[in-house]
Amino acid sequence: MDLFSPAKLNLFLKLHGKTSHGFHEMTTQYQVIDFGDNLYLESSNEDSLVCNLPELNTPQNLIWKSLQVFRDYTQIRSPVAWRLHKRIPIGAGVGGGSSNAATALYALNEHFQTQLPNSVLQELGKKIGMDVPLFFSSGSAIGVGCGEKILPYKDCKREERFVLYFSDQGVLTKDAFSYVRSEDFSQREENISLYKKENDLEKSVFRFRRDLEEKKQMLKKMWSPFHAHVCMSGAGATLFVSYPRKLEIDPSIAKAIHATIQNSQGVLVNSLRKHSGWFPCPDNLFATTR
């Protein structure tokens, strides 16, 4: 079984305070995108995991946690072999590890024909990581609580395109949250549409990653002719640009946009939704422009 394991963006992320357990409460808009990894699953004589990034061939890989959670719930112990082809950078803030974990849960459910509904898979996903339940939604959702409570959201941003800018150095989630100050918190809004397209974690991350702050300012200047918006996803280190798809109707503007993407080494992506089953695999995962 070969499944696409997509990345996600946080189109906005607002922090509201801390829980009694020390976790940060938030409201965030998630969007799954057509860029990601591939995960292969097959029966085997013993459990194994092989990844094209050797540093992920460890017991700490969340795929192993998914397998354990699935086994605890179903009592199925048959050994399986995994192969993971990574494209999503480590520590990028676009849900690479969480997506792999969710994809693994879905794959196990299909492989062993256990017919667990999405509601159960979401609950199992919460035991693995805060972002994992997202991937059992349609791909467009609002996250509340600590981000793990998923609410459906129809606005899938098909009228926008996104350009990803990865960093050579990732950001650890624990570091991003450790620099948060009380003045970084935002008030809750009654209507989701009232939230500005901002990521409150930028304030904390930029305190120890000035290079990302400088990169954001550079991207804002570069993309200003196209009325584009620049934001950090999750805890970083990925920055992304969003711009109106309708701009590409004009051939000259479309040409200028694609030249900007190529010159800045961005990765052009689109929103991705599923209507049933799992997320479809895009035709071309390697091109920087499509």
UniProtKB/Swiss-Prot annotation:
Work out whether the entry's keyword set contains Transferase: yes
Q: Is the keyword Aminoacyl-tRNA synthetase in the record?
A: no
Could you tell me the EC number(s) of this protein? 2.7.1.148
Q: Which reactions does this protein catalyse?
A: 4-CDP-2-C-methyl-D-erythritol + ATP = 4-CDP-2-C-methyl-D-erythritol 2-phosphate + ADP + H(+)
User: Listed GO molecular functions?
Assistant: 4-(cytidine 5'-diphospho)-2-C-methyl-D-erythritol kinase activity; ATP binding
What pathway is this protein a component of? Isoprenoid biosynthesis; isopentenyl diphosphate biosynthesis via DXP pathway; isopentenyl diphosphate from 1-deoxy-D-xylulose 5-phosphate: step 3/6
| Keywords recorded for this protein, A-Z | ATP-binding, Isoprene biosynthesis, Kinase, Nucleotide-binding, Transferase
Provide the top EC class: transferase
Q: Name one Pfam family in it.
A: GHMP_kinases_N
Q: Where is the active site?
A: K8, D131
Per the UniProt entry, what are the Gene Ontology biological process annotations, in alphabetical order?
Answer: isopentenyl diphosphate biosynthetic process, methylerythritol 4-phosphate pathway; terpenoid biosynthetic process
Which SUPFAM superfamilies is this protein grouped with? GHMP Kinase, C-terminal domain, Ribosomal protein S5 domain 2-like
Q: Which InterPro entries match?
A: GHMP_kinase_C_sf, GHMP_kinase_N_dom, IspE, Ribosomal_Su5_D2-typ_SF, Ribsml_uS5_D2-typ_fold_subgr
Which residues are ATP-binding?
P89, I90, G91, A92, G93, V94, G95, G96, G97, S98, S99
Q: Which family does it belong to?
A: Belongs to the GHMP kinase family. IspE subfamily.
Described function: Catalyzes the phosphorylation of the position 2 hydroxy group of 4-diphosphocytidyl-2C-methyl-D-erythritol.
Please identify the protein, giving its name as recorded.
4-diphosphocytidyl-2-C-methyl-D-erythritol kinase
